[in-house]
Amino acid sequence: MSIASIFKKDNFISIPYIMSHKIKPTFAAFLNLIKVGYSVFFEQVLMRIGFMLTAIMAADQGTDAMAAHQVGMNIMALSFSFGDGLQSTAVALIGRSLGAGDPDLAKEYGRTCRLIGAFIAVCLVGIYYFGASGLYHLFFREEHIVAIGVSIMHVIIFVVIFQICQVIYMGCLRGAGDTLYTAIASTISVTIIRTVVSYLFGYTLGFGIIGIWMGVLGDQIARFIFATVRFKQGKWVQIKI
């Protein structure tokens, strides 16, 4: 479907139009791609390192704890999908607003998407809190694993509140071209804060798998603070790509 769409003559990106008008890529466009994309590339690499370190520590807690942890990660991914969808909306609307020279409208779009995300987060918190046991019983019959999962869910309800909002704000910043800041913020939060807090609570303080999830919560709070502060400063609307 994606390939077919770019062969339509009336699309914004149209292969027939490009070929008929002999449009060729320029070196300046290539430099812009590198300028915007290099920070995102390193951000993703370093974030994956942070995720891997967290997974290693979770696996070290034992098979039962790891099983409960993995289900918790899948449940958290569900809430991420809501934030990711609103992030895509914010990126498109903010990009269009900034392109039209209307930074105030871009900020309003960001705030509106964040409010919608906060409402969804509150709804998910209720579902996760009251349905924690039921959700884990869909995966496990062993009550001791379900008990571990319920404890994890009690941390996830706090994670969700910060997660959805930070994903939206990070998307707003990326849509404006502030990719270097988001890369630095994500690297500090995921690779450093998540790893250190997980080790501190999971091993040093002896909370086990719940301590690993405290690291996940610390990561989300840090990213939320970084993204919110940057968004409210408003400097991102002045970035030229």
Model-derived segments and their meaning:
Residues 1-4, 22-53, 78, 82, ...:
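Hydrophobic faces of transmembrane alpha-helices in multi-pass small-molecule transporters and flippases
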Residues 40, 44, 52, 56, ...:
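Transmembrane alpha-helix boundary and packing residues in multipass membrane permease domains
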Residues 45-72, 78, 96, 136-143, ...:
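Helix-terminus/linker motif at the lipid-water interface of multi-pass membrane proteins
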Residues 68-132, 163-186:
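Small-residue-rich hydrophobic transmembrane alpha-helices
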